[in-house]
Amino acid sequence: NLSRPNSIRLREANRSNNEQYATSSLGTSFLIDGAPISSNANLQSLKNAWEPQVTARDFSIMGVDMRSLTTDDISQVEIVRGIPSVEYGDLTSGLIKIERKRGGKDLSLRLKADMGSKLFYLGKGWEWGKGWTLNTSLDYLYSNKDPRNTLEAYQRLSSSLRLGRKFQLRAYSLDWQMNADYGASLDGAKQDPETNGGYEDSFQSDYHRVALSNKLMLKRRGQQWLKAIELLGTSSYEWQDMKRIRYINLQQTTAAIREMRNNSESDAFLLPYSYRAEQNVEGRPLNIFLKANACLALPIKFVKDELLLGTDWALDKNLGRGQIFDYQRPLYPQHSLRPRPFSDIPAVHNLSLYAENTLSLKAGKNKFELLTGLRATHLFGLRPDFALSHEWTLDPRLNLAWTLPPLSIREKALTMRLSAGIGQHSKSPTIGQLFPDPSYIDLTELNYYHPNEALRRIHVRTYVVDNSNIALRLAHNLKTEVSADLDYDGYRLSCTIFREDMSSGFRQMPLYAPYHYKQYDTDGINSQTITEQPRLEDLPVSDKYELIGRSYTGNGSRTLKEGIEYTLSTKRIEPIHTRLTITGAWFRTTYQNSQEIMERPSTVISNQQIPYVGIYEDTDWSRNQLSNTNFTLDTDIPRLQLGVSLSAQCAWFSSTQRKALNPYPTAYMKIDGSIVSWQEDNQDDTLLRWLVRRNATANTQEYVTPFSMNLNFKVTKKLMQGRINIAMFCNKLWDYTPNYNDGGLVIRRYVDPYFGLETNIKL
């Protein structure tokens, strides 16, 4: 489904769509030819939006949208779910390393069509002279979820130019690579005016990215202490534009707040009951990344010892104008919002230093490997009051492996490799999380209505609160894993047991504080004789306080991942030219808050909301489990130039369960802002008893989805000595999804088959 942003979640059961746990996808790093794709300056979010067609397309804190990645140029993909080298940082969950094709002389053409998308790709390679290569490519993708609905579609256009040169000299080899890339994504939806009363209702999000990178690799020959040097420089600039248009119909008199940048009082003006509203978001992210490292060979007898030393620096800045709208025609009239240029947000500099030692020792037929590393990270460009401005974050990582002596079974060798690792991984906050928009708290002091519009008056006190998250720190994920790999006569088995605990993920959290305002009494005004707007100095006034909440980003989310991953592959059985591959996993993922949360009950007594805010140790706890296995039969018949693949996707079970929360607060805030510890007898108080959460222990049943299975089929035929490949696929060709009972209800399941055709041509 390409109608919504597609973020990656590694090692998660029944992945949560809750943005409070988005650090898992934000903390997955993507490298293309060594250059990272940074989303730290992505601020494309339509503030105060509530419509699904808008919020479902917001991935400003979700990391990389994988829809924007083209796959046809890829020659190799490495997915590091475990503990990567300390050379790679600013990540918590995993690493995706993509290497693209280089060299060759073929002209490649690919055409693909399925039930939801159409793809065109054209690529060409050149080789000439002494080590020169050039690769170019162009691809276009069009997708809509429902082919009958052309008003909602996603489009992608990308092109790439990759130039390289290899120098072979007497003492060393030199590899230079230069990449220039362009990518565009157009995503939008709109309603047919004929079904919307003739009014326009549309959303459009456009994205254009230009990237340039240079990489230089020097490798020494022979027994030299300096083995290799790598230099990498990359930069990218993006044009991000978002537009939302809809027609507003108000049911009551609504005030619009004037533009005020500091604490002050002013009169508001009244909005018309109906109008056309438009709000734009203009983002211009700039990302620069520089990296240098050297690999040294240490002269130790009988031991292979290599030392990697390096540093990298990243800059993230947004030069856009931010939220753009008309104060007198706001898109969301019930919310307080003022525009702030993204360019006013400071640039953030991320500097890292790292060192890693790789030790390899052979003792008889045993081989031992030990990899130890340390990465240090510091953020520059922050004000002195930020906690991160004074901290260096250290990420130690360790991997060890033991390759046992081979065992002879029926005159064939069985090899076994045992490995284990532990390491910390850290992700820095985005600039939007460090420097969010200020909060504008508008408190109505006077609201006088008169049938004569000229006599109406609304007076507002505005507080402007700096929301800079000075206490925010990096998100840390501690990974531990143990794995075993066996290889016997072409049969391979691997199994990994892992545990990942990220207790400081980024989370939007409420923060309450008391705010003072005046309340003017208009009961004494004679609406029949008044000839001008009421004057404040002529009205009785009283002082009031109100507990108002605002949102801030804290390290308050915990994601605990546990599980087992396994893979079994057989060698190809020659009589039937078939190989069996079995992959599967069991995942258990726990989501919960890791810091105390403020909540104010919505109960109203005597026309006033409860004047207390509860402080609770837990507000969210859920545990998901999943177990699945994929069986793939892959048949390749060279004589017929025919390939057939049949896979069975078995979901043994999945479940979700919520935990009973503590209904009592640990403390509460009074109207004056003071914090008082909760006492047992508070639950008998007329007002304080409403702080006891009545539904905290409800709905703790575990919901289990039983076994289901889908069959997928693909056939590939080669023509003209393999220059033309034609493939047809059908996913969910057959399924087993029986009905099941859940809480006395019969749950009926069904799946829709999905098929398509693709052609690959090489000339």
Predicted regions and their residues:
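Short acidic/polar hinge/loop motifs at secondary-structure boundaries
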Residues: 35-80
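C-terminal beta-signal and adjacent terminal beta-strands/loops
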Residues: 426, 502-504, 510, 650-694, ...
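N-terminal periplasmic accessory domains that precede
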Residues: 6-10, 30-31, 63-67, 87-111
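Structural signature of Gram-negative outer-membrane beta-barrels, strongest in the C-terminal barrel
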Residues: 346-492, 496-501
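Extracytoplasmic beta-strand/coil segments of soluble accessory domains associated
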Residues: 1-49
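Transmembrane beta-barrel wall of Gram-negative outer-membrane proteins
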Residues: 108-142, 149-236
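Face-selective signature of the C-terminal outer-membrane beta-barrel domain
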Residues: 167-183, 205-385, 406, 563-565
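Gram-negative outer-membrane beta-barrel transporters
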Residues: 501, 518-662
